[in-house]
Amino acid sequence: MLIAGAGVTGISCAIALRERGVPFRIVNKGRRVGGRMASRIVRDSGTPFDGRVFDTGASYFTVSESEFASVVAKLETAGVVQPWTDTFHFADAEGIAGVKTGPMRYRAEGGIRSVVEYLAHDLVIEEGEITKLPTSERLALCMPTPQAARVFPPASDLSSAVWEPVISVSMLFDHAHWSDFDGIFVNQDAQITWIANDGARRGDQAPALVVHMSPVLSAGHLGDPSEVIPIAIARVQKILGFDEEPTWSHAHRWTFAKPIEGTTSPKPGFVL
């Protein structure tokens, strides 16, 4: 079995195959595992926070299935993940409007990528890109469907699934200019959808925020994600109520961040 992609899906697939004694190999386009469970190390920022990790992709994860709960329990025992919070704030375009309780969200002190790195620590992963389907192997395409269709043309029907882009903007400040919070869902705002207190999420209480831009705004700036940084700063200042500028910022583009609409009639053997 050939597994294309070393995000959490690809690594989980590999672990399941290994447990069943099925031979496999993993090929990953990037140098590091994780996919959209991504973290970035701050470098050359001119701040005291060089070496610090930001979560630039998935913000957290929740547990709803008992089988996954057993995996998370092992990760927690190993110190890889920690319970974070079950309460987030919500805001509108003018500011924070209230709080909402939901399922427990889990964080990873070493960055959410460290979860996948831990799971993959004893797997052999080849770096490279699959450009055509090997005829002698079964294939697991563990990637967004538009990318899968490029590798495997018979999966072109799956490329009809609609995916939203997101640009995430990471920011560092000289100190926290905001009251305590973990995360804020921003509703009915044309520019941003989410603000994470990365200092609370990481557990180091650093004056660090991560903002997710709206899909529509992100789609217009995929060619140069840095263009949205001033917009993100202005919205954060408005919602959190301060005027200070960040000492460092960085924008990351996710062209295929999440699916919002899938194909309804896949060919036999293809499942989203």
Where are these regions (language model features)?
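A conserved short coil-to-beta-strand element within the FAD-binding core of flavoproteins
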Residues: 126-135
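Conserved flavin/dinucleotide-binding core of flavoenzymes
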Residues: 32, 56, 206-272
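Beta1/beta-strand and adjacent pyrophosphate-binding region of the FAD-binding site
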Residues: 1-9
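Glycine-rich FAD pyrophosphate-binding loop
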Residues: 18-48
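N-terminal FAD cofactor-binding segment of flavoenzymes
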Residues: 16, 39-88
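Short beta-strand to alpha-helix junction loop
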Residues: 60-66, 89-118, 222-231
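Central helical "cap/lid" subdomain
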Residues: 34, 49-51, 137-185, 242-244
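Active-site substrate-recognition segment that forms the wall
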Residues: 171-221, 231-240
